[in-house]
Structures are given as structure tokens and as C-alpha cells.
């Protein structure tokens, strides 16, 4: 019997592992390990991964995995194998589109949920010793956090 393991860094395999509505426990475990939330994630709903184009000139974008937690937090997980030298801006673009899309239909800024982007990279992006890094918006003068919505 020949056992062949599939590379989980391949888009199709990654999406089958983490974006499956049939096996949410895998995604929940991954998110709890990455985010380390105060209250563990116990439930996720997989969402449509297509980013709606606002203008004709925009390119089509599809996220790898997009989910909502039981608390309404929206989480995007991207797997990137190749360094296309645009990951930071690409991640910010995806985050902004996801965040803005949550406003539509609700009409209240206060209803915007916490939105988290997790990038799983098969290359070194940052000059950091640790492979797991978390970034937030904060005041660069006094280090006070502006919000945990991002």
C-alpha cells in the first residue's frame, strides 16, 4: 500500500483542510492556537470567499478561507507559498475590503466586527526572529492601542 501525503501549502489542499464546513474543529483549533482569544472560539461559519468588485478596473480577488466566529468576529486566513513582494499591502487590501463589506446593510460603524487576517507564509516576510507575529494599531508615541477591532 502506497501512502502519499498531500502538501497542505497547496491552495486546494489548504482550503479543504481549513475551509471545510464538514470539519470545523480543525479550523477552530487552528484559530484558537493562532489568536489565543480570551474566550476560546467554539463555533465558526465558513463564508463566501469572493471579494466583490466595486469598480470595473479592480481585479477579481478570492480569499483562501473566510469565517465568522460565534462572537461575530470575521477571520481571513491566507496561505501564500511564493513571495510576490506585495504581501503586506495585499493583506491590508483584503482586510479593508472585508471590514468595509461588513458595514454594508448595517449602516452603523458601531456594528463593525473585529476583523482578523492571518497569513500563513512559506517564505520569510519580516526581519523577525519569531515566526508568529501579531500586529495591531497603536499610538507610536506612547504605545497605547487604538483598537482591537483589527
Language-model segment annotations:
Residues 1-150:
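Elongated, amphipathic alpha-helical interaction scaffolds
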Amino acid at each position: 500500500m502506497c501512502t502519499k501525503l498531500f502538501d497542505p501549502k497547496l491552495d486546494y489542499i489548504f482550503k479543504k483542510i481549513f475551509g471545510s464546513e464538514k470539519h470545523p474543529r480543525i479550523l477552530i483549533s487552528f484559530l484558537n492556537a493562532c489568536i489565543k482569544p480570551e474566550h476560546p472560539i467554539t463555533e465558526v461559519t465558513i463564508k463566501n470567499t469572493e471579494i466583490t468588485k466595486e469598480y470595473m478596473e479592480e481585479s477579481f480577488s478570492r480569499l483562501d478561507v473566510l469565517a465568522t466566529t460565534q462572537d461575530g468576529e470575521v477571520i481571513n486566513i491566507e496561505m501564500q507559498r511564493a513571495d510576490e513582494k506585495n504581501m503586506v499591502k495585499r493583506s491590508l487590501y483584503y482586510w479593508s475590503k472585508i471590514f468595509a463589506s461588513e458595514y454594508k446593510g448595517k449602516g452603523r460603524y458601531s456594528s463593525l466586527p473585529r476583523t482578523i487576517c492571518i497569513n500563513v507564509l512559506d517564505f520569510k516576510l519580516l526581519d523577525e526572529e519569531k515566526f508568529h507575529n501579531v500586529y495591531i494599531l497603536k499610538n507610536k508615541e506612547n504605545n497605547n492601542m487604538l483598537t482591537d477591532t483589527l
